[in-house]
Amino acid sequence: MGAKEACGVFGAHSSKGTDVVPKILKGLEGLQHRGQESWGIAIPGKPVFKRMGLAFNWINFARELSTYKGASGIGHIRYSTKGRSNLGNAQPIQFGNEFSIAHNGTIFNTDDLKKTVMGSRPGADCSTDTKVVAHRLLQILKEENDWFWAFERLAKEVVGAYSFTILNKQGEVFAVRDPRGYRPLCIGIHEKSGTYIAASESCALTAVEADFIRDVAPGEIIRLGGPKRGFEAFRFAPKVAPAHCSFEYTYFAHPSSVINGVNVYEARKNVGRILARSKRMKGKVVIPVPDSARPAALGYSTESGIPMDEGLMKDRYRRKGSMRSFIEPKQGGREEVVRRIIPIKETIKGKDVIVVDDSVVRGTSSEIIVNALREAGAKSIKMAITFPPIMHPCYMGVDFPSREELLAYRVAAGETDIEVIGAKVAKSLGVDELHYNDIDGLAEAIGLPKDSLCFACINGDYSKLGPVKPKKELKA
């Protein structure tokens, strides 16, 4: 608990000319768990409409949005990994009359791309990685004049993670996923309105009553609309070993989503079950840290035979009570969200408690929860962490920006024994016992081949991304 990930994207195109704006807004609400800082939509012939805050607040702007109607458009939910959290960096981003773009991920080699962009556009705004890569795309499009071939060229220059939705001036919508498939992206259809949809997760399709078709394959661009009036797919990069983010399955994604053929809820239950089987602890009650750890706690309880109960509840009736701590842009905001988690003393007092959480990142959230459990009278506190120790930064779209901010690294730098790391983290947090899942257990729980998942934040293996070094700008 306590990390951020870059955003959710959405796109829609109706072959029947149906207004897709209501679906975009509902779709963004369905992706709210992926970002809480800002939201926005783009349709042909209108300025991008974007606001700070949560997507369901669109109702406060209903009068302004009433003029936004169109048969195609894109939307975005933002949490910042690069660039400051302000309206200027909110997305979608419009580039003249050519296109608007929404991005989930992080582009690593922005410095190299920036030099190329600035060579012909010295005044270009390159304040975020999305703006840099979009400027470069614009340059290539002027030479290629074909979206499919443009991405074939762009892919050879860009290093990083990207799932894009793009709206061009012709009203076509494109869904693009990087060759490794770091971030999720899928397409679906709303049959009644003839609307094809692209979204970060299938839960957004459910939100607009659309049917899932398939994932966008890594290295694939799909055009919604266009001359074929359905969808058209093109592979812009050769097939390489995928590197799907393993953290999506334990924390980021919505439990109802199916990503790369795996139901997230089942993966989380499995990871709890496997953790209980491999790391047995004695306790009287299993308590999840709300909300993402609930399925894992159920799995842990089922496997261990220790009853599960709700000992921590989010106060959803106070400011920020229902929000996610990991994707708050500032530490103070993260702590405020966690302090809205209220212990239920009757469940906790006098008991040996096993707390199941999805991860330990910076450790500040865990410290607050542990203190709350102590104050509620827990006899002992043991922790089961479903994601292995996070020891390295992420350059593919998650806010693990520097080793020094990672608790496991701070207390166990250089250590490779997962049990020793767990013991040192337990001591730092003031708990009686703490056990992590390991990479093999996590891969087994997810149900995908181990070599198709990214574990770089755990083992520091960035070979699929390329040679990388820590970069200060990733703290932005």
Outline where the language-model segments fall:
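Hydrophobic alpha-helical segments characteristic of transmembrane helices
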Residues: 256-257, 282-310
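A conserved beta-strand->alpha-helix junction
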Residues: 126, 131-134, 308-323, 427-446
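Conserved short alpha-helical segments that host acidic/polar catalytic motifs at enzyme active sites
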Residues: 1-218, 223-284, 289, 349, ...
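Phosphate/diphosphate-binding loops
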Residues: 204, 211, 219-220, 274-279, ...
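PRPP-dependent phosphoribosyltransferase catalytic core
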Residues: 155, 170-172, 177, 209-215, ...
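Flexible loop/turn segments at secondary-structure boundaries
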Residues: 81-82, 109, 173, 182-183, ...
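Short, glycine/charge-rich flexible loops or terminal/linker lids adjacent to PRPP-binding catalytic cores
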Residues: 305-353, 363-367, 391-402
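Secondary-structure transition/capping motifs at alpha-helix termini
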Residues: 143, 280-284, 302-309, 345-349, ...
